[in-house]
Amino acid sequence: IGIYANTDNGLERVDYVETDISGERTDVPDLVGRPRRDVVLLNDGDLTFAKVRLDEMSRNTLVNGIDRLADPLARAVTWSLFWDSVRDAEIAPQELVSLALQGIGSEKDMAAITTVLAQAAVCSGRFMAPELREAANMKLVTGLAGLLKDAEPGSDAQLIIAKTLIG
């Protein structure tokens, strides 16, 4: 379990507790009495296959600042849990589209950029209710155009964004 706090350098891990999960609920005595931080991330370090969900405070922090999450592996776990949440119909597909457009511009991992933008395209084109699809596609195209404009010229990120934009 990674504990993250907002700092001048972004969302940084300030504590880590190894825990074995057994059953539907597991007490974590090592965290009792410690101050609540901005993000509590289960499966931090991606040590096992697990469907992870966020508590409300962690979710709100990451929705408004996934790009501030300093650790690339923690970001990958976070991107994955948001995708799982869409596939399990726990969050709306347009939320993942918005999150991708807001957070992917500062992502440095090309695999993450490729995966997240592909997932945003799936959300916009297939997972969206038919009556919302046109607006979602317009939002995605407009957002991708902005990301393309802001990307470093000739970079891998620019190429990935361009490929996503043209489908």
Task: Cite the ranges covered by each PLM segment.
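Non-catalytic accessory/interaction domains
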Residues: 1-167
